[in-house]
Amino acid sequence: MSGKRVVVGMSGGVDSSVTAWLLKQQGYEVIGLFMKNWEDDDDSEYCSTRQDWIDVVSVADLIGVDVEAVNFAAEYKDRVFADFLREYSAGRTPNPDVLCNAEIKFKAFLDHAMALGADTIATGHYARVREAGGRFELLKAFDHTKDQSYFLHRLNQAQLSRTLFPLGEMPKTRVREIAAEIGLPNARKKDSTGICFIGERPFRDFLNRYLPTKPGPIRTPDGKTIGQHIGLAFYTLGQRKGIGIGGSRDGNGDAWYVARKDMAANTLYVAQGHDHPWLLAHTVHADDLSWVAGHPPAEGTQLAAKTRYRQADAPCAVTRATGDALTLTFQQAQWAVTPGQSAVLYDGDICLGGGIIASTEAASLEQAVA
């Protein structure tokens, strides 16, 4: 690969640092690019942007690559954060990492890299790209425990054709070993968590800065009022902690879970017990679809899906896939399927794409106990 120029998204973390080193070893001309996609945190105790940039520069000096910083804060707010707030305001629970990958890391970043004369880009994501018959497939990572294809399912053929995922073929333990072996200064740095580019702030405090609170009743499925919520945007389906109603009511010690939101009545419904029927769904409807191959799978196809990150693949049938509407029917009832999250389809290790969960249909009693 001598002479090929690759621009690597370097975050200051171990994964992107090892990615840059591996590509340098393979003969690529490597340029590191540090993305700053959030502006309002420079004085925050939760901000790590400055330290991340210091780590990027230290790694670049050690492995001998050029590095520069680019500010995509305006693009992030317009393309990702505005949608994030709209979804929460509508009572849904979005996954901004999915949109951030499609709009920032593999669009704004890719465009910038091409302007730098890059032949390709690379990131530290755990996933794989395979060319087959002139088309590109997105595959799960070799290390399924770290697989990030769920977050990448909106990537298209043009994006995948210009993308490398060097870590996709190795376990995370080996990445840490390489970092230590070559003496990376961030070899022991913990993996980042929290919302994409927003960090590890207490989420409720962060959201409260942008969305107004509108308290309302908390009710049980039979309509009994048992508390007051602070605003529907601050709760998500399946949530157990932080509801504020205690752990035992109606003579039953089972935990309470957020089960439904009635936006029109500003009412939060909670159900008692992990396997309450209100928490189970057999059919999932999604829209805002995106397919890696550019077209949906055929109706009637038996596949598997994830309706949240780190969920085990769940067998399902594609019962509708026309236009911008997708319906999945699962063999077994799925727990706390949440509107706003992504439903992502897989054929074995191949990630086909998916869409944003719009609504669900409750499981029957037989399906609920299966």
From Swiss-Prot:
Residues with site note (Interaction with tRNA): 125, 341
BP GO terms, sorted: tRNA wobble position uridine thiolation
Keyword check for Magnesium: no
Primary residence: cytoplasm
Annotated positions binding ATP: 9-16, 35, 124
The organism's place on the tree of life at top rank: Bacteria
Keyword set, alphabetical order: ATP-binding, Cytoplasm, Disulfide bond, Nucleotide-binding, RNA-binding, Transferase, tRNA processing, tRNA-binding
Catalyzed reactions: S-sulfanyl-L-cysteinyl-[protein] + uridine(34) in tRNA + AH2 + ATP = 2-thiouridine(34) in tRNA + L-cysteinyl-[protein] + A + AMP + diphosphate + H(+)
Residue segments, region Interaction with tRNA: 146-148, 308-309
Subcellular location: Cytoplasm
InterPro entries: MnmA-like, MnmA-like_C, MnmA-like_central, MnmA-like_central_sf, Rossmann-like_a/b/a_fold
UniProt entry tagged with the keyword RNA-binding: yes
Disulfide bonds: 100-196
Pfam families noted in UniProt: tRNA_Me_trans, tRNA_Me_trans_C, tRNA_Me_trans_M
GO cellular component: cytoplasm
Recorded GO MF terms: ATP binding; tRNA binding; tRNA-uridine 2-sulfurtransferase activity
Active site (record annotation): 100 (nucleophile), 196 (cysteine persulfide intermediate)
EC annotation from Swiss-Prot or TrEMBL: 2.8.1.13
Region (Interaction with target base in tRNA), start-end ranges: 95-97
Function: Catalyzes the 2-thiolation of uridine at the wobble position (U34) of tRNA, leading to the formation of s(2)U34.
PANTHER family the record matches: MITOCHONDRIAL TRNA-SPECIFIC 2-THIOURIDYLASE 1, TRNA 5-METHYLAMINOMETHYL-2-THIOURIDYLATE -METHYLTRANSFERASE
Family: Belongs to the MnmA/TRMU family.
Protein's recorded name: tRNA-specific 2-thiouridylase MnmA
Organism of origin: Ralstonia nicotianae (strain ATCC BAA-1114 / GMI1000)
